[in-house]
């Protein structure tokens, strides 16, 4: 009778969002056998967060608006994309550098709006003007003219954070400019200082390490490169090692045939963002901001994908630093943690179909408690809060969900 009473008390505590660290392993083991409890405890270990162990600086989370192929974002869609209080909280906008200077001004309204919300704007060129190309290759004799074209664009739109001179130059048969890593390096070495904005490169199709390393072997190009960027089509995020540059993932989408409201697909994206951050990367940029499969749909609604992105973008702001954290402490649970001053933000992806109790330990920071925000198949950025005592606590993660903890 006493054992049953203890079990029932712990059940009540857990499902009330208990943050106590005093639940014993024996009690947890007993709970897992209780016929009315669906909480998962299998292979659960503590997620250890060391806020004193600093990793990469985070630049943000964002998406693309490409006017050559899609109508511009509306005012309402810009707010929903970039507002950290009422929208997704994107802090990066990616745009296309047009081949015609007559189209430069069309980019400016959304660029200005994104900047107004504090977002960084990065611009990628798919092609140089045709007069500067032979087929799908940039003429070496046109390097200076192409740099002047990029610089003119930067001036026309009021300045961007960085420019990529080539989009997926290693994607053979794409229809846009192709170039070897050596060729991209040669252009940046010769003209990277004349493009009007800092250079991001080489932006390969599949974040190809060999391509990136070959590009960076050009010491002059490397010195003129602000940060390395690339896309993860066909590639699982991975750590590029000590390349001496911040790494941005500047384009990807998971499935264009599935609605942005498909919950399983949204959870796939959640894990992908986790993987990018856990690989030491500084930024994650989705493909189209507004698309049926994107974070905002064609009817201007924030989708489930958008709310999943918001679990990162709203709370992990540019300038936050990722800190050491147990990445996969329990079966189906993935954790990253970030710090800004004394504030700690923890993002947890729970892939399990059952409520999962996850314990945490903290060092290097002593919060009094957390605001908890979570998104699952039925809730969007739901909120509650809890206090903690000491350097350890535990919480319930709702089934198939993304949870963000913000210290207070």
Regions found by a protein language model. Name each.
Residues 386-408:
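C-terminal beta-strand-rich structural cap/linker in extracellular carbohydrate-active enzymes
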Residues 34-108:
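N-terminal hydrophobic targeting/anchoring segments and the immediately downstream early-domain regions
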Residues 48-53, 85-216, 220:
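Substrate-binding cleft and catalytic face of glycoside hydrolase catalytic domains
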Residues 57-67, 90-97, 120-125, 161-165, ...:
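Structural recognition of the beta-strand scaffold that forms the well-ordered cores
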Residues 177-270, 279:
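Noncatalytic carbohydrate-binding groove/subsite architecture in carbohydrate-active enzymes
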